Amino acid sequence: MSTNSKVLALKYRPVVFEDVIGQEIVSQTIFNSIKQNKIPNAYLFTGIRGVGKTTFARLVAKALNCRNGVDKLCKEKLCDSCHSISMSNHIDVLEMDAASKTGVDDVRELIDFSRYGPTSIKFKVFIIDEVHMLSKQAFNALLKTLEEPPEYKNGGALKFIFAT
């Protein structure tokens, strides 16, 4: 067996918006909003399991923070930001699985983390997967920060991406 084999879903995972298949209108709309700097506080991606919601959320996070800018998103040789976001280990792009972290304390931890500006990129991004699993109290705790996210000294802001 080959030591460099890769699961097909990972091998063909979209790296830039042009790679996304079946969601061209959504891809173009979000790409244009980022390009024109008309970025909403939050995005909500819905769909059946395996459709690519979390992958698309990472694409948006990369587009917001790529060192090359949204027009020249990294495809082959990834900048530090894009590489870290792709590997899910960027300090300013936080992914939370709301299926396992459903409580108010988990959301309060997010809110506390949002008080500090991004360390190396413009936008701090919170990707909350399975957001529908948050308890009512947890979502209520998140609501104020969602409606009025902090703006940071570097001109950036906090952006939420929800997947359900």
Spans of features found by a protein language model:
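P-loop/Walker A NTP-binding region and its immediately flanking N-terminal helices
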Residues: 1-163
